[in-house]
Regions:
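ABC ATPase NBD Q-loop/coupling interface
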Residues: 34-50
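Catalytic Walker B motif of ABC-type/P-loop ATPase nucleotide-binding domains
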Residues: 134-137
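Conserved ABC ATPase signature
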Residues: 109-113, 117
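Helix-to-loop junction immediately C-terminal to a conserved catalytic motif
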Residues: 25
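Conserved ABC ATPase "signature" region
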Residues: 87-105
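A short, proline-enriched helix->beta-strand linker immediately N-terminal to the Walker B motif
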Residues: 128-132
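ABC ATPase C-loop
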Residues: 102, 121, 126-127
Length: 282
């Protein structure tokens, strides 16, 4: 992975995703081969310690780890344990809470927050340690639509700030927004590349065989093409799908404008005349 890149890891339960994350974080040593993160190898205890200082790991349901009386105290826990000066701890706490949009909540009890806010507060505690690599294990699992939208916005903001991100996800829509996608099946990589490459027609059989689908916008586009619509390209996000459909909508409007006068109540496009009276008396 390149610095500042976002990589999505997808696969069915039991495919090896969480094990791969633990290897990346230095929580486990590889049985064979090497794992190198930010210049340190995880083959030795010293190397794994070095990796753990560079990697922030947000496990599933991190909000369950909240414990302090205030959000500020909870987010400060990690930086304080690093032995940083109080002023630096305060700076990091404020910066992390601003990143997740909870700057106004730092004096609140974390248990007064909504479910989505609790997760953001827990993530802020990891961000306050300023990791070079942020590892997210199913960050949107269990959240309502608003919470998922906020989390996706946070990931986009972190990428804009140059944070390198690895996220495990079951959401093909989240994977489609990454720079790089790795597909695992039974602890083996079966596809690896950009979202466009991984979700190409050539890989459709592989994905189906391991129980994975396509991002919904791309799936809709291919269904429309198979039904006779013009080629729509490979829209991976809802925004790209809307852009691809725009010209078709314009063509439909133009065809309507070139047809019969809309004031004419006669048949149009071969459809039968309506049997509904134009006016109904009181």
């Amino acid at each position: 992975m390149r610095e500042g890149e976002c990589c999505a890891i997808v696969g069915q339960t039991g495919s090896g995703k969480s094990t791969l994350l633990r290897l990346l974080c230095g929580l486990e040593a590889p049985d064979a081969g090497t794992v190198e993160v930010t210049g340190a190898t995880t083959a030795t205890k010293r190397g794994r310690r070095a990796v753990r200082h560079q990697v922030g790991y947000v496990m599933q349901h991190p909000e369950r780890q909240l414990f302090a009386q205030t959000v500020e105290q909870d987010v400060a826990f990690g930086p304080r344990n690093m032995g940083l000066p109080a002023a630096e701890v305060a700076r990091r706490v404020d910066h992390a809470l601003d990143l997740v949009g909870l700057g106004a909540k730092k004096g609140f009890s974390p248990f007064e927050l909504s479910g989505g806010q609790k997760r953001l507060a827990a993530i802020a505690g990891v961000l306050a340690m300023e990791p070079r690599l942020l590892v997210l294990d199913e960050p949107t699992a269990g959240l309502d639509p608003r919470g998922r939208t906020r989390l996706r916005g946070l990931v986009a903001d972190l990428r804009a700030h140059g944070v390198t991100i690895v996220q495990v996800t079951h959401s093909m829509e989240d994977a489609a927004r990454a720079d790089h996608v790795v597909v695992l099946d039974q602890s083996r990589v079966i596809a690896d590349g950009t979202p466009t490459e991984v979700f190409s027609r050539a890989n459709a059989g592989k994905l189906h065989a391991c129980g994975l689908g396509l991002p919904r916008p791309l799936s809709y586009a291919r269904e429309l093409e198979d039904a006779g619509a013009p080629a729509l390209g490979d829209p991976l996000t809802i925004e790209e799908l809307a852009a691809a459909l725009g010209p078709l909508a314009g063509a439909g409007d133009a065809a309507s404008a070139a047809g019969d006068d809309p004031r004419d109540d006669g048949p149009r496009n071969g459809s039968p005349r309506s049997n509904v009276p134009e006016e109904v008396g009181a």
